[in-house]
Amino acid sequence: MTQGKLSVANKAPGTEGQQQANGEKKDAPAVPSAPPSYEEATSGEGLKAGAFPQGPTAVPLHPSWAYVDPSSSSGYEGGFPAGHHELFSTFSWDDQKVRQLFIRKVYTILLVQLLVTLAVVALFTFCDVVKDYVQANPGWYWASYAVFFATYLTLACCSGPRRHFPWNLILLTIFTLSMAYLTGMLSSYYNTTSVLLCLGITALVCLSVTIFSFQTKFDFTSCHGVLFVLLMTLFFSGLLLAILLPFQYVPWLHAVYAVLGAGVFTLFLAFDTQLLMGNRRHSLSPEEYIFGALNIYLDIIYIFTFFLQLFGTNRE
């Protein structure tokens, strides 16, 4: 009876008469009863059987591919921790940023090393007083060579001093100064035009090799065996020249040695450059910025010295 009153009350005026005139007859819609209170719902009392139909299965808020059934085995124990999804979605981008920062750090250190070496070479080349002094005192050359060798072994073989600040920068500074002295003394025996010419050739070659190493798809880091064989060939060729030099100077043999040395260290420059990139077979850790700068610096210095032996003219 109550439902009939509610049904009549909810109709618009004149609707009932129009339906009777047309001979239509409709059943009044059933109005659901009020929902149970919280106490009744939790205690199970006051509910009549069949009063409320069973609701449909809850639909997950995420799509089916993103939904994980807690009762199923996902293959990972304990599931993903909080923030793990964000780590995977940004890992490659963060790794690329770290690699770019590493490359900038290496080339910043390398630029400082090359500027210091260039200043020492210019001092030993243009200043006659300094040039005469270093040539008259070869003991400083051998002392610098000993310091260079000791610091190079320390930085190349000991990861502790190489990775810990400030010892890594202190050792690298000593290494750079000793190598700059050796390069400057070698340059003092050649005329100014030869030194400037070799500096320009070295700059062009190193810049071209660096750009090529970054752009090419060829992986130089996978050719370390070939580079080792070439390095051993260069070593034994230099040993042979050292044995023959006191007896007789062979110009063509010395020229072949200089060409071989410049070619080998040009390949090593490409190899060490690609070690910085991180998308090759072998790559340096971002912690090894000192080691990366050390290798490329040595490659450039050796290329310059071999060009100096090949194109340089001795002072009169």
Swiss-Prot record:
One example of the protein's molecular function in GO is: calcium channel activity
- List keywords of the entry alphabetically: Apoptosis, Cell membrane, Glycoprotein, Membrane, Postsynaptic cell membrane, Synapse, Transmembrane, Transmembrane helix
Q: Which InterPro entries match?
A: Bax_inhibitor_1-related
Q: What is the topology of this protein in the membrane according to its UniProt annotation?
A: Multi-pass membrane protein
Cellular component (GO) terms are:
endoplasmic reticulum; Golgi apparatus; Golgi membrane; membrane; membrane raft; postsynaptic membrane
| Tissues of expression | Expressed at high levels on dendrites and to a lesser extent on the soma and axons of neurons in various regions of brain.
List the GO biological process terms: apoptotic signaling pathway; cerebellar granular layer development; cerebellar Purkinje cell differentiation; cerebellar Purkinje cell layer development; cerebellum development; negative regulation of apoptotic signaling pathway; negative regulation of extrinsic apoptotic signaling pathway via death domain receptors; negative regulation of neuron apoptotic process
Region (Disordered) spans which residues?
Answer: 1-49
List all annotated glycosylation positions: N191
Key word Transmembrane helix present: yes
Q: Which residues cross the membrane?
A: 106-126, 138-158, 165-185, 194-214, 225-245, 251-271, 290-310
Query: Where does it live in the cell?
Result: Cell membrane; Membrane raft; Postsynaptic cell membrane
Q: How does it assemble?
A: Interacts with FAS/TNFRSF6 and BAX.
Function (record text): Antiapoptotic protein which protects cells uniquely from Fas-induced apoptosis. Regulates Fas-mediated apoptosis in neurons by interfering with caspase-8 activation. Plays a role in cerebellar development by affecting cerebellar size, internal granular layer (IGL) thickness, and Purkinje cell (PC) development.
Please give the family membership noted in the entry: Belongs to the BI1 family. LFG subfamily.
**Name the UniProt record assigns to this protein:** Protein lifeguard 2
What is the gene name?
Faim2
